[in-house]
Amino acid sequence: VGELVAFSCRRGDLIHTGGPGPTAQEGIRAHQKLQKRRPKGAEAEYRLQVQLECAGQDILLEGRVDILHPQADLHQPAQLDEIKTTYCHPGKLPETTRLYHWAQLKIYGFCYLLQQRQTGSSVEEVSLQMVWYNLKEKKSYPEQSLFNWEALESFAGDALSLYIHWHRSWQAHRQQVIQTAKSLSFPFPDYRPGQRQLAVSAYRCLRDAGQLVVEAPTGIGKTISTLFPAIKALGEEKLDQLLYLTAKNSGRQVVRETIAKLHGVGLKLSLLELSARDKTCACKLGLCSRDDEGTCPRTQGFYDRLPQARKQLLGQPWITPEALAKVADQWHLCPFELSLQMLPWADVVVCDFNYVFDPLVHISTLQDPRYKRALLVDEAHNLSERAREMYSASLSRRDSRRAALACKSNHPQLYRRIQSLVRALAQWSKRFQEQHLYKEIRSSQNVQAWCSPLDSEEDRPATVSRAIQKVLDTLSELSEQGKFPPEEIGEWLKSLYRYACIEQILSGQHQALTRVIDRDAPWQEHQLKLMCMNAAGFLQESCAQFHGAIFFSATLRPTQFVTEQLGIEPETPYLMLPSPFEPSHQGVFLCPFVDTRYQARKSALPALVDLIARVYFSRPGNYLVFFPSYRFLQMVVEHFQKDYPEIQPLQQTPGASDREREAFLGSFSEGAQSLGFAIMGGVFAEGVDFVGEKLIGTIIVGTGLPQVNEEQELLRQSAEHPQTLSAVNGFDIAYRYPGMTRVLQTAGRVIRTESDRGVIILADYRFADMFYQNLYPKHWQIQTSKSGEQLSQQLSCFWKQQRLSVCNVE
């Protein structure tokens, strides 16, 4: 019933309330409360199930109505109650929402009367009661109407006809997908070494609804080796839909290219790309303007124009942001919302991690257990850190004060509520400053920071929570009046909603991080962060909703660290594949004569600049030098330019636009001799293909350790706590493993194909430590360079060997 109503019965405007609605937990509690009050003889969660024929189609229609009051006598028909929770008076609900609620109840009424008729009853009428429960007032608002069979049959018939005609079109497309996927052949003449093993393992995993972890070196073809078997599983109807999760645009591009190859060998399949709302919003892109009440004209009458747009996109091979924008313009619809409406009808969906794992923005329809959806998680080495961020939330006193001031003129009540939150944040911090109850994790002239548990209600910042709830209540009241807060506080509101969301799901993996900045200033900055130490449990819970999941990356090591961070069971298959390329094509040189630790950086500058120059002049071409921070990068660039003014290095800049990034990458072309300076873990260090002569070497400066700050220290301390059942060292969890992941990802830019040749320079004495040696890929043939002079000799020898091997091949 829910699926039918959602598809066929929405009319009018797309409604945004301006804030989060009632949570699932609030809705469940309200339902249970009202169901307990039901009179004797009434049934809660009454199951309705009917079989019927409509438009030549056999239909099984089922659902559960909240309360059934059986027919008491001939003069009093049976009554069905449907409960909906709200934060406002039902009279202030948008008409679109009220009609949608009533549509669901009418379909339930139709099912009930048909169920009675199919059992021989002559009942012709049913009483339907919509019960809106106002969570703020803790009060019910019932609305009741009597419906006869003829009216309900007509209403349900119209809804079913719409759905059946759509479903037939979708089934025709689906049969094409199944037939072409079944006969699909691998789009290359041969498998690379390791590719077939990966494809077979991936197929078995998805067929059996299992999980698989894959570390496969760069260049092996992870995308085709996971997508191809997954699509074969679609063809055999083992799966209904594939979700390909990737965090970077470069990852999306590889998926597009892979699907294009499969289309080229006969596959008929639709791919939908979900982009962030901010990147597709027509108002933000200047394509339309909101009215005086903040309403986007593309949301007005959205559901009335949606069917035509949906029909136009069904079965299209490429439902990309560009294709969505074009159709959205034609039908004057919101492009982002149109993409969400197409989500159930695409065969492959490419999107960011957050649409599956983020508790605030995840798309609930993706986790419908009735459908067999599988996850393909690319760049899985980034997932644990991203997930910790998704399950964390923070508030700033300074940002809250700015938000309050922005509301002062036009929304005085909201201003007062936010000011109360500003005071509550200061009071929470003063508790730490004055009572010395909790351990300081940092204290300097400018900053104080404490961590505290969140295990019990007594430990939690209740005053802050109450202040937030009052702000949310006021926002709901404004929304009911058709008023909205100023756009300039939009980002602050997102942080407020996230805090309210995370507060509802706090676990033993959360701690409070409290900071006081400018501690001696007249107006101090206070920050409160609900910080997730390990999101493994949340990831595990999310993955359980899907029919199989494959996590893959070029760097997923060591296994124990990865499984603990991703919530993967120890018995899960873990596939570690060798490099498909000739090891001698890659020279790896360890340079222990350079010390890049923070306190030694100034003294290391001459040796480091000399090292970079030696590598570059050993064979001029395209090189990238990677640093752990922009500050260090800038120091080296300035020193390098003084010593080698004839070379004009390129450098990555913070906050670069997409166009600036493309220009940077465009400088690394075949035949060029570009020397670039970039950041480890940044956009140029992961997911970028530098094929052939586009990159012949990387110089990795330092071990990539994350910057020491309160968050990383809290992460380290939490992992070392006696109650934490981890066999992995806290310093390794917080610093060394994430750093080494960056190093290995960065090194993977060099060799991308069988014909590539290049060098990797590990510039730091710590790389000689046994900890790091144990993490190096097996195919690395490492040479130690004890001085700059020796490095030059080794590089000369390496490039000479490469020239000879190329000549021999030719």
Q: What positions do the PLM features span?
A:
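Mg2+/Mn2+-dependent nuclease catalytic core
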Residues: 50-153
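Conserved RecA-like P-loop NTPase helicase motor core
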Residues: 592-603, 654-767
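Signature of the SF2 helicase/ATPase Hel1-core->accessory helical subdomain module
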Residues: 226, 331-348, 353-472, 554-568, ...
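Walker A/P-loop
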Residues: 207-229
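A contiguous, basic/glycine-rich beta-loop/short-helix subdomain that forms a polymer-engagement track
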Residues: 324-349, 360-366, 471-595, 603-604, ...
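A substrate-engagement module of RecA-like helicase motors
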Residues: 178-181, 185, 238-349, 357, ...
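Metal-dependent nuclease catalytic cores that hydrolyze phosphodiester bonds in DNA/RNA
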Residues: 1-71
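Conserved pre-motif I regulatory segment
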Residues: 172-215
